[in-house]
């Protein structure tokens, strides 16, 4: 909220290298231009407030960008402005720029000053909140889990503050070996937002830092507005390292609480939540060991019972049982094999006898034994037809027990009647009735 008047710069002969202006001339012209500017309403945050001789000297910072101006409140005006104004307050002021020629300094003379309306602050804060929410910076799925046991904790807090002491003391009570990297910053005033923002960047770049805690021990609404600074909040949201907000104000939560991965109600609460309690963890380990021991004991007992059951079975109670059962089975196989072998031998002997008989039947000697004779010529050829032995042909009659010599008288039709009753010779192609039995 501001009100300004535009003033045209007075024309003047431009200085040159040969005709430069004296410093006093330049200073006088600057003062003239500034005096013509008149008064203006400005809005900002008081970042410095100090009194001397009834007067107040301070600085006013822009709410959105990094810009600061000095101001002076004369004692005559001091009595007319609210008594509770001071560092950290957000105000609107009617100021008149003054340029001090002798020192070359510019300051704003405060003619009026009042608190910014709480409604205006809340409205501006709510607009920023809605913008950040629309960008997804408050989404739950952006929240990262804190490491179970951080190797090093980055702590951003005021130097020698109660918040620093609370975090260090309680964290070390829970886990004595925990390590910290502490970055001290202003936690209120015009430097706070910038210093906290830079500290987040420094710790986020440190590979040893596993989690970052921003801690302040509470404060009024005005003092906590620094933790709703847009640049600070966006830097916290972009931080790659899990971040914990421990500002410690329940009624008016700063925007930092909404983008942090974890919001702690107090610095003490933050310390307890970023490191585990060593006594609780030891107790859990002991309980786990006890459960594992009981389970292992139960399993061992179960296996022992199974082994005893197996040992009580016949197959394991007497190992000779296996040999005996196999011996009986082997005996049955041997007896069966002997029986089958005997049958095969007997069948073979029968077949051999039959073949021998058949061979004897087919043998020429067998024919001779039956009373027949073989008639051969002198050259040993068997005589088959009468015409082959004309009268006077020498013959040999081969009998079963020897041979006789004879001479043919030629073919004759006079065959003794007894010759017709001689047994017929067996067929020369006679074979055994059947082959070997399989």
Swiss-Prot record:
Give the location in the cell: Cytoplasm
The cross-references to Pfam families, in alphabetical order and at most eight, read: Exonuc_VII_L, tRNA_anti_2
Q: Which reaction does it catalyse?
A: Exonucleolytic cleavage in either 5'- to 3'- or 3'- to 5'-direction to yield nucleoside 5'-phosphates
Give the source species: Clavibacter sepedonicus
Q: This protein is called what?
A: Exodeoxyribonuclease 7 large subunit
Key words, A-Z = Cytoplasm, Exonuclease, Hydrolase, Nuclease
- InterPro entries (UniProt xref): Exonuc_VII_L, Exonuc_VII_lsu_C, OB-fold_nuc-bd_dom
Q: Would you kindly state one Gene Ontology biological process term found in this protein's UniProt entry? A: DNA catabolic process
Q: Gene of origin?
A: xseA
Iron-sulfur in keyword set: no
Subunit record text: Heterooligomer composed of large and small subunits.
| Task of the protein | Bidirectionally degrades single-stranded DNA into large acid-insoluble oligonucleotides, which are then degraded further into small acid-soluble oligonucleotides.
| Listed GO CC annotations | cytoplasm; exodeoxyribonuclease VII complex
- Map out region (Disordered) in residue numbers: 406-438
Entry's EC annotation: 3.1.11.6
Where is it mainly found?
A: cytoplasm
Q: What GO molecular function annotation could you give as one example from this UniProt entry?
A: exodeoxyribonuclease VII activity
Q: Which family does it belong to?
A: Belongs to the XseA family.
């Amino acid at each position: 909220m501001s009100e300004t008047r535009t003033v045209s710069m007075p024309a003047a002969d431009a200085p040159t290298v040969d005709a430069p202006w004296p410093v006093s001339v330049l200073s006088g012209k600057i003062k003239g231009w500034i005096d013509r500017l008149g008064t203006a309403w400005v809005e900002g945050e008081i970042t410095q407030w100090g009194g001397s001789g009834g007067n107040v000297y301070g600085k006013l910072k822009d709410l959105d960008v990094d810009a600061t101006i000095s101001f002076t409140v004369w004692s005559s005006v001091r009595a007319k402005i609210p008594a509770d104004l001071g560092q950290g307050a957000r105000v609107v002021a009617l100021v008149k720029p003054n340029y001090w020629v002798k020192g070359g300094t510019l300051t704003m003379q405060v003619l009026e000053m009042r608190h910014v309306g709480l409604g205006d602050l809340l409205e501006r804060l709510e607009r920023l909140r809605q913008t950040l929410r629309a960008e997804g910076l408050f989404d739950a799925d952006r929240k990262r889990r804190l490491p179970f046991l951080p190797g090093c904790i980055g702590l951003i807090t005021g130097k020698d503050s109660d918040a620093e002491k609370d975090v260090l003391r309680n964290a070390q009570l829970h886990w004595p070996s925990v390590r910290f990297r502490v970055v001290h910053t202003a936690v209120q005033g015009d430097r706070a937002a910038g210093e906290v923002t830079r500290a987040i960047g420094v710790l986020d770049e440190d590979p040893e830092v596993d989690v970052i805690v921003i801690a302040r021990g509470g404060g009024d609404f005005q003092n906590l507005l620094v933790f709703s600074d847009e640049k600070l909040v966006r830097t916290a949201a972009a931080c790659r390292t899990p971040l914990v907000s421990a500002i410690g104000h329940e009624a008016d939560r700063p925007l930092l609480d909404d983008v942090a991965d974890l919001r702690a109600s107090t610095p003490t609460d933050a310390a307890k939540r970023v490191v585990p309690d060593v006594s609780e963890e030891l107790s859990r380990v002991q309980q786990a060991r006890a459960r594992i021991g009981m389970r292992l004991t139960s399993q061992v007992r179960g296996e022992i019972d199974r082994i005893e059951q197996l040992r009580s079975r016949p197959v394991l109670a007497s190992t000779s049982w296996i040999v005996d059962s196999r011996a009986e089975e082997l005996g049955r196989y041997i007896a069966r094999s002997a029986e089958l072998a005997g049958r095969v031998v007997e069948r073979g002997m029968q077949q051999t006898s039959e073949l021998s008989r058949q061979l004897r039947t087919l043998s020429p000697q067998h024919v001779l034994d039956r009373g027949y004779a073989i008639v051969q010529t002198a050259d040993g050829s068997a005589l088959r037809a009468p015409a082959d032995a004309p009268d006077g042909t020498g013959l040999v009659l081969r009998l079963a027990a020897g041979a006789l010599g004879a001479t043919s008288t030629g073919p004759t039709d006079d065959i003794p009647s007894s010759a017709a009753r001689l047994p017929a010779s067996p067929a020369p192609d006679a074979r055994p009735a059947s082959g070997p039995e399989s």
